């Protein structure tokens, strides 16, 4: 088999599928190569005893109507095909060092009110924290992207420390740990994690943390369906084993199926 495509995407995780949707809907010939049996990457779900269990994305923020993630899903053409359910009012519970359970509440007003009720002496610092997190989070709004700029107001916080910012806002060691309690969501490391990452994750979830009823495999399936509708191709069970080049230009991908076959797809762009 030998086919030519405008774009070849290696891997069908969320990023690969999103690229496939955007490029195929613009009329490009897209082929996605995936070594697993089904597309999705960390979006894949599995079933045990009649229950669907997600492997990677358990909940996602900014999925409320008008939220930036919801707008992206609508742009991809899948927003209305997914069963999106908001999490409970207390969308997350953190327990730093086993010192008790502390809820993260939906909405900035409730988030601030709840933490202030637990740490009344830190009211001003909690307010400062919320204001800055919201400011950074709003820097990736849809209107910013429409202007052709990439989060110009927030990128400067990539060089700021999340831990230092939290320490500047509040003095109580326990509250500092509570505010940093979601760091596993972004692989947070005290010495290195930037304020930008911390703010984007917490802002997104405070604004609109939701889950996908039936599992996140539905996201992958819906994106894959859009790609095929736009004429794209998704090859599953196909491992990319080599890139072919001519001079300094990549010209194709070689696919290997054990020792039995090797298929080369020629393309001008590899993602």
Question: Where are the regions a protein language model picked out?
Answer:
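N-terminal glycine-rich phosphate/pyrophosphate-binding loop and immediately adjacent elements
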Residues: 2-132
């Amino acid at each position: 088999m030998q086919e030519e495509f405008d774009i070849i995407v290696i891997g069908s995780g969320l990023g690969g599928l999103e690229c496939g949707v955007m490029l195929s809907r613009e009329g490009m010939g897209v082929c996605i190569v995936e070594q697993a049996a089904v597309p999705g990457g960390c979006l894949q779900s599995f079933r045990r005893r009649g229950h669907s269990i997600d492997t990677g994305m358990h909940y996602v923020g900014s999925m409320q109507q008008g939220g930036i993630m919801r707008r992206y899903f609508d742009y991809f053409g899948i927003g209305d095909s997914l069963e999106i359910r908001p999490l409970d009012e207390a969308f997350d519970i953190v327990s730093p060092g086993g010192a008790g359970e502390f809820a993260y509440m939906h909405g900035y007003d409730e988030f601030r009110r709840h933490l202030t009720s637990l740490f009344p002496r830190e009211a001003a610092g909690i307010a400062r924290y919320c204001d800055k997190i919201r400011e950074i989070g709003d820097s990736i709004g849809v209107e910013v992207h429409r202007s052709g700029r990439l989060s110009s107001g927030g990128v400067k916080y990539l060089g700021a420390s999340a831990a230092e910012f939290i320490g500047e806002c509040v003095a109580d060691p326990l509250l500092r740990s509570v505010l940093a309690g979601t760091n596993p969501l972004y692989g947070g490391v005290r010495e290195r994690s930037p304020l930008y990452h911390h703010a984007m994750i917490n802002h997104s979830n405070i604004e609109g943390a939701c889950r996908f009823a039936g599992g996140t495999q539905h996201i992958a399936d819906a994106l894959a369906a859009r790609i095929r509708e736009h004429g794209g191709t998704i090859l599953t069970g196909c491992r990319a084993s080599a890139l072919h080049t001519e001079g300094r230009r990549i010209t194709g991908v070689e696919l290997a199926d054990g020792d039995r076959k090797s298929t080369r797809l020629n393309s001008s762009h590899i993602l």
